[in-house]
Amino acid sequence: MSTIDKEAVKLYLMQLQDQICQRLEQEDGKATFIEDAWYREPGDRLGGGGRTRVMRDGNVFEQGGVNFSHVQGNAMPASATAHRPELAGRRFEAMGVSLVMHPHNPYVPTSHANVRFFIAEKEGEAPIWWFGGGFDLTPFYPFEEDCQFWHNTAKEVCAPFGADVYAQHKAWCDDYFYLPHRGETRGIGGLFFDDLNQWEFDKCFDYIKAVGEGYCDAYLPIVERRKVTEYGEREREFQLYRRGRYVEFNLVYDRGTLFGLQSGGRTESILMSMPPLARWEYSYEPQADSPEASLYQHYLKPREW
């Protein structure tokens, strides 16, 4: 059985943050990430630190953030113990990289990725650990070929780890990024997994590496294809309207957001995923046979790619 190596995970996650930031800056060609390094004394409700990096007003990206954090606490918050009661009363460490990119152009999808590691320990008992993460895509004006490329890349990421991994983690993504009050998915999905510890530590660690590095391979070719597509006020207004769904999901359902806020995490870093602008419109209905209607009819429901 392979040994749990927290330091190796932390080092890798910091390197992954660097690598992703570099590739996104290259794609944007103008904006750079501004780093806000932060630290909290262990005596706080949630101690630890991180590197919040935010990009604004680029050629391609209106706003985006790539966060690394490593925090420790003496008790897990309710959002974590609700489905894992055995964690109650254990001290814990959580570390991860989380990112969201909001492009200017409505034809370029919003994207999100996350890889994380949790370990909960109690004296005299074996540690409870797991990995989690994934990546998902939220197009406003989707192209079939882009969606297929995104999911084919996800399949390639999963293939070395088992024949059924993609299907399982795709289905989990479809279920997780679903807004029950709207009756629709947030986007076209991708991969999502949590509580990953059924393999040995090293294999689980290798899987989050593949997912973390697969994000740019899946996303940047789509950005490259769509970033020069012409658009007007109609497309921009629809993009802002659909960004409202992103806000609704993150504030109402997202376990990472809830965990961070309930455990006394750093609010600015937790809410980094919010879009810079969004809008709501009462009782909106897309025009029949329009590109906007196509999004609802063909893409905001689970399907095989």
Swiss-Prot record:
Gene3D superfamilies: Coproporphyrinogen III oxidase, aerobic
Keyword Oxidoreductase: yes
Intracellular or extracellular location(s): Cytoplasm
Essential cofactor(s): a divalent metal cation
GO molecular function (one): coproporphyrinogen oxidase activity
UniProt region (Important for dimerization), positions on chain: 246-281
Superkingdom, taxonomy of origin: Bacteria
Positions with a binding annotation for substrate: 98, 114-116, 264-266
InterPro entries registered for this protein in UniProt: Coprogen_oxidase_aer, Coprogen_oxidase_aer_sf, Coprogen_oxidase_CS
PANTHER family, per database record: COPROPORPHYRINOGEN III OXIDASE, MITOCHONDRIAL (PTHR10755), OXYGEN-DEPENDENT COPROPORPHYRINOGEN-III OXIDASE, MITOCHONDRIAL (PTHR10755:SF0)
Quaternary organization: Homodimer.
UniProt family annotation: Belongs to the aerobic coproporphyrinogen-III oxidase family.
Function of the molecule: Involved in the heme biosynthesis. Catalyzes the aerobic oxidative decarboxylation of propionate groups of rings A and B of coproporphyrinogen-III to yield the vinyl groups in protoporphyrinogen-IX.
Protein name stated in the entry: Oxygen-dependent coproporphyrinogen-III oxidase
